[in-house]
Amino acid sequence: MIRVNSLQVDSRLLPLSLQANAGEVWHVIGPNGCGKSTLLAALAGMIPFSGSVQVDGLDVSQASLSELARHRAYLAQNNKPSFQLHVFQYLALSVPANVALECSEVASEIDQISRLLNIDDKLHRSIHQLSGGEWQRVRLAGSCLQVSPVLNPSARLLIWDEPAAPLDIAQESLLYRLIERMAGQGLTVIMANHDLNRTLRHADQVLLLSRGVLYRAGSAKEVLTQEVLQSVFGTSIRRVELEGHPHLLFD
């Protein structure tokens, strides 16, 4: 369980609280500059904050980076490293330090996750030969290996900042299959997202931020209303039903 009490990051993010359960998928949404990345970095223990964040009882503000790495994976928006590395080497570095790379579980997890993300034919490529979407899928695979319950029983949380940003439509579908897999294994997934229709379909809980303030929190149905979204995003939005499913239309 993830418990957050009065989390604040100076004037960038005003106090907010939440409680997230195992297997839940949380989307953090809001206009650019509203505090999404700040919130995720604080939850991951990467920047100073006031208040408290606990991941399965671990006090994030007091934990070392190695302790945090055992309990959560954090994927920020990032460029490729400048040094030379092959995909399989990058994935090997993502495996928990106390797990032998030779064990069958590691090979199985790498195989399953790389196949799911359609990167199994790229394991022997240099990361500098990858497109933006390919590199992002490799990074997603690495973060999942870090907190795979099969390899790391202490893992509880996946934190992703705009994981779909570099992906095309087909690759984005693979991402949401991966999210379903990881949540199904009992991990809590907290991610920033810009595609509100994806949030409407896939999020168990939604945090809507506006100018550093938690404007609304609740289920997708409760938060993604026409009135609320128009107020925060300042644009005309309609919610329609198509083949029995809700969709948001933007002018």
From Swiss-Prot:
It is an enzyme of class 7 (translocase). The keyword Membrane applies. Part of the ABC transporter complex BtuCDF involved in vitamin B12 import. Responsible for energy coupling to the transport system. It is a peripheral membrane protein. This is Vitamin B12 import ATP-binding protein BtuD. It is found in: Cell inner membrane. Keywords: ATP-binding, Cell inner membrane, Cell membrane, Membrane, Nucleotide-binding, Translocase, Transport. The complex is composed of two ATP-binding proteins (BtuD), two transmembrane proteins (BtuC) and a solute-binding protein (BtuF). Residues 2-236 form the ABC transporter domain. Its main location: membrane. Its EC number is 7.6.2.8. ATP binds at G30, P31, N32, G33, C34, G35, K36, S37. Belongs to the ABC transporter superfamily. Vitamin B12 importer (TC 3.A.1.13.1) family. PANTHER family: METAL TRANSPORT SYSTEM ATP-BINDING PROTEIN TM_0124-RELATED, VITAMIN B12 IMPORT ATP-BINDING PROTEIN BTUD. SUPFAM superfamilies: P-loop containing nucleoside triphosphate hydrolases (SSF52540). GO terms for molecular function: ABC-type vitamin B12 transporter activity; ATP binding; ATP hydrolysis activity; ATPase-coupled transmembrane transporter activity. It comes from Vibrio cholerae serotype O1 (strain ATCC 39315 / El Tor Inaba N16961).
